[in-house]
């Protein structure tokens, strides 16, 4: 029986690209990598209530461009932009480069694996039944247009003495098909009985062209809806 590799890593440079997009000399690479990790960890803690799905870091010449994909941009921006300015200043202190901060709204959080996994984790921490949380997440994703979804939860489910793994799937999730657009995420729920791990796979369709940027464009189209006819480009 084969092991399941990370679907995102398997599809890099096929229909998905990296979340850190920069090049550095050997002597600078380690420092910039640690800086990236520190920025991501800080955003994860600082914007815990904002539903952060993805953080993209780009480094053009002597600049650092951070793009936060979030389900609740208003929580990050704050009243009259006060909170985002505070966040930008804190992030600027973590890097020597000129920092630019962008916020992108995720309009369909039910179609984002990271947000679905974190939603299940929050429900488990509130002592909601794991089966109910899994089923609700699967139904919401399928209703919003997913072609398939699988949810795994592992740990001392329901306070059981022995840890086990339960899963729920609807539709199809073709992990071996490289052209399949599969979003994957992992989250953890801290319960009185220990840590429960949640894994989510969401199948959104197939991307036929060999283009690392294709998934980002397709995700944006799913968020914005189909372009009107005659708006340019081939139909």
From Swiss-Prot:
Keyword line: Ribonucleoprotein, Ribosomal protein, RNA-binding, rRNA-binding
GO terms of molecular function: mRNA binding; rRNA binding; structural constituent of ribosome
A family per Pfam: Ribosomal_S3_C
Top-level taxonomic group: Bacteria
Coiled-coil positions: none
GO cellular component terms, semicolon-separated: cytosolic small ribosomal subunit
Region (Disordered): 213-235
SMART domains registered for this protein in UniProt: KH
KH type-2 domain: residues covered: 39-107
One of the GO BP terms on file: translation
Function of the protein: Binds the lower part of the 30S subunit head. Binds mRNA in the 70S ribosome, positioning it for translation.
UniProt similarity note: Belongs to the universal ribosomal protein uS3 family.
Assembly description: Part of the 30S ribosomal subunit. Forms a tight complex with proteins S10 and S14.
Name the record gives this protein: Small ribosomal subunit protein uS3
Annotated gene: rpsC
């Amino acid at each position: 029986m084969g092991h399941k590799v990370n679907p995102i890593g398997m599809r890099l440079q096929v229909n998905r690209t990296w979340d850190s997009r920069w090049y550095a000399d050997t002597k600078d690479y380690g420092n910039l990598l640690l800086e990236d990790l520190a920025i991501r960890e800080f955003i994860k803690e600082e914007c815990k209530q904002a539903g952060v799905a993805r953080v993209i870091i780009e480094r053009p010449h002597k600049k650092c461009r951070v793009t936060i994909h979030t389900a609740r941009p208003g929580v990050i921006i704050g009243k009259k932009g006060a909170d985002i300015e505070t966040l930008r200043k804190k992030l600027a202190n973590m890097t020597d480069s000129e920092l630019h901060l962008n916020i992108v709204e995720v309009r369909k959080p039910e179609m984002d694996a990271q947000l679905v996994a974190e939603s299940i984790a929050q429900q488990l921490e509130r002592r909601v039944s794991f089966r109910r949380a899994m089923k609700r997440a699967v139904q919401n994703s399928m209703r919003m247009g997913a072609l398939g979804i699988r949810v795994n939860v592992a740990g001392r489910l329901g306070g059981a003495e022995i840890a086990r793994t339960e899963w729920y799937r609807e539709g199809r999730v073709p992990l071996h098909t490289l052209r399949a657009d599969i979003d994957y995420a992992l989250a953890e729920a801290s319960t009185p009985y220990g840590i429960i791990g949640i894994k989510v796979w969401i199948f959104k369709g197939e991307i036929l062209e060999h283009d690392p940027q294709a998934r980002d464009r397709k995700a944006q189209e799913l968020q914005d809806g189909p372009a009107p006819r005659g708006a340019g480009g081939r139909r």
